Amino acid sequence: MTTNLQEKLTREARPMASNDSITFYRDFQKFYQASKTFFFTNPLVGRCKRDVLAYLHEDQDHCIQHAKQVAIDAGTLMLVEGRGWDPAQMRQWSLLAQIAGLLHDIHAPQSDHARTGAHVARTIIASYPLEEEEQEAIVFAVRHHEKPLSTTQTPCVCHWVSNALHDADKFHWSLDWMPTPLGETRPETRPWADQNTCCKVPADMETIRAMASTFRTRTGQQYGPQFINAGLATGEHLHQRPNDHILP
């Protein structure tokens, strides 16, 4: 795809997948800013960022920017869902959610990356100054960030962290493979619409559309469909373009 066409598609698609079309960040601005500040200032989060660099690369489908945004949004969801609970506890659980967000795709794009990534995550955080239960919550969240989760006999902190990670990840499934930056954190360098991508768009869109009913948290159930719809609007726009306008 030529640079001029990339720029044109970006201009066309930006209004469809902009922050303005997703009210989550506006409605929970205080919590989002708190999570974002925490992400950039907390020493343990900083340590985790350095630890995962060997596993996350800009040219992968699940890249550094995806991990970053999922981590911040998982922390935000934890703070939003925990309103009315002990603030100190929820800040700590927000930390766990952010670490899980950074780690969740360290073995992507392997088909079994959630399970294998959980094993690697356990090794990475083994020396972190966290309680055993907290480390288990991170590993549990990484292992279960893709599929439906049974709530039977699972420690509370595991569910809180796992649900926040799951929903934050799904927020961005429909956006991170589209050619439009969401705020300052969407990657701009990924190949956008090569031949393989064009062939996959309809099936991918159906898969993503089905995700609207799979969010686990109350906040995710309310706001998740906005993310889904923003990504779908962009995908449908690209799919409707003549192939000779999209392909190099």
Question: Where are the model-predicted features located?
Answer:
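Membrane-interface starts of transmembrane alpha-helices
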Residues: 131, 135-139
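Short glycine/proline-rich turn/loop motifs
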Residues: 48-55, 99-100
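Divalent metal-dependent phosphate-bond-processing catalytic cores, especially two-metal-ion Mg2+/Mn2+ enzymes
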Residues: 1-38, 56-91, 103, 130, ...
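His-Asp-centered metal-binding catalytic motifs of divalent-metal-dependent phosphohydrolases/nucleases
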Residues: 70, 90-117, 138-147
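An active-site-proximal "capping" alpha-helix that borders the catalytic cofactor pocket
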Residues: 70-77, 113-128
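Active-site-adjacent bridging/hinge elements
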Residues: 42-50, 94
